[in-house]
Regions:
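Nucleotide phosphate-binding/pyrophosphate-handling subdomain across enzymes
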Residues: 1-80
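Active-site-adjacent beta-strand anchor residues
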Residues: 33, 60, 111, 130-131
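Cofactor-binding loop segments of dinucleotide-utilizing enzymes, especially the Rossmann-like FAD-
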Residues: 59-63, 85-86, 133
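Short active-site-adjacent structural elements
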Residues: 39, 66-68, 90-92, 118-120, ...
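Short amphipathic alpha-helical segments
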Residues: 42-44, 70-72, 94-96, 141-144
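C-terminal helical cap/extension that packs against the catalytic core
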Residues: 28-29, 71-127
């Protein structure tokens, strides 16, 4: 049997990379392995709770997942939406995503790599929210560890 204080203490020590992970507080950078609109609602709830709005959102979700649903969900909180791809050849990413979203009058910026997306996102002071597959999450983690 565990006491409530023990449970709280142990939960506070829990680290789950890529799940609502704050990589930096200044500038604010949040990383989440969100690949559908439903899980995106949880991300938005956390952002609202933290008082984070007007973000640059990086989305690295392959075409066979709900990239469009995630972008639609985040567009009200985003100043910019940057689409990117993982270096993992198992996943398919293309500029067709940008074209599909443009048909819905959702403006996005396409980048060919996670590194390029992070560089572009860092060029302005907005908070950064990075959403994508575990391969994108892994690439972001590696880049942040090197910096």
């Amino acid at each position: 049997v565990f006491s409530l204080p023990d449970i709280r203490k142990n939960l506070s020590l829990l680290h789950w990379p890529g799940r609502m992970e704050v990589l930096r507080s200044k500038p604010f950078v949040l990383l989440d392995a969100c690949i559908n609109a439903t899980s995106c609602e949880n991300v938005k709830e956390v952002l609202r709770h933290l008082g984070v709005w007007n973000c640059t959102v990086i989305v690295g979700i392959p075409e066979d997942k709900d990239y469009a649903g995630v972008v639609r969900s985040m567009k009200g909180m985003a100043n910019r939406i940057i689409l990117t791809r993982s270096g993992n050849p198992h996943y398919h990413f293309s500029q067709k995503q940008q074209e599909t979203l443009a048909e819905e009058d959702i403006g996005t910026i396409w980048t060919d790599s996670v590194k390029q997306a992070l560089t572009l996102a860092g060029s302005c002071p907005d908070p950064i929210v990075i959403l994508g597959t575990t391969s994108v999450i892994s690439e972001v983690e590696q880049i942040f560890q090197q910096s």
